[in-house]
Structures are given as C-alpha cells and as structure tokens.
C-alpha cells in the first residue's frame, strides 16, 4: 500500500526539526451543494530546519516519530521574496 502524500503550507517552524503544515481540502456539502473549505494542521519532521512559514511543502506518511509527528517533509518550494 503506497504512503499518503499531502500538499500544504508551513504555518509554524518554532519547534526543533518540526514544522506545522496546514493542509486545505475542498468538498461539496451533501445537502446544500455548496463548496466548503476545511483545513487541518499536521506536525511534520523537517530534519534540516530548512522550511519557513509560507513555504509550500509535500508531506508523506511515516512511522510515528514522536507523540504528534507521523509525517515527514518530502520536498518543498521556498516562498518567493520580492
């Protein structure tokens, strides 16, 4: 079974070797047929502390690393600065 991969935006990098990633999803409400946005935060392992808030990253499921971390950062794109 392949590992799940999610795309999200780094919200926080205040913990050592950990980033908090916000993953947004959109779905249609079954009764009202309105498109709804929901988001969820995931704690992900960032070995080299290379990602900062605002960066787009892809996270992949992994074995439990700590109490909250079950995801690792696979790759990412640095936020463009002007």
UniProtKB/Swiss-Prot annotation:
One of its GO terms (cellular component) is cytosolic small ribosomal subunit. CDD domains: Ribosomal_uS17. One of its GO terms (biological process) is translation. The keyword rRNA-binding applies. Keywords: Ribonucleoprotein, Ribosomal protein, RNA-binding, rRNA-binding. GO terms for molecular function: rRNA binding; structural constituent of ribosome. Gene3D superfamilies: Nucleic acid-binding proteins. It comes from the Bacteria. InterPro entries: NA-bd_OB-fold (IPR012340), Ribosomal_uS17 (IPR000266), Ribosomal_uS17_bact/chlr (IPR019984), Ribosomal_uS17_CS (IPR019979). It holds the Pfam family Ribosomal_S17. Belongs to the universal ribosomal protein uS17 family. Part of the 30S ribosomal subunit. One of the primary rRNA binding proteins, it binds specifically to the 5'-end of 16S ribosomal RNA. This is Small ribosomal subunit protein uS17. It comes from Nitrobacter hamburgensis (strain DSM 10229 / NCIMB 13809 / X14).
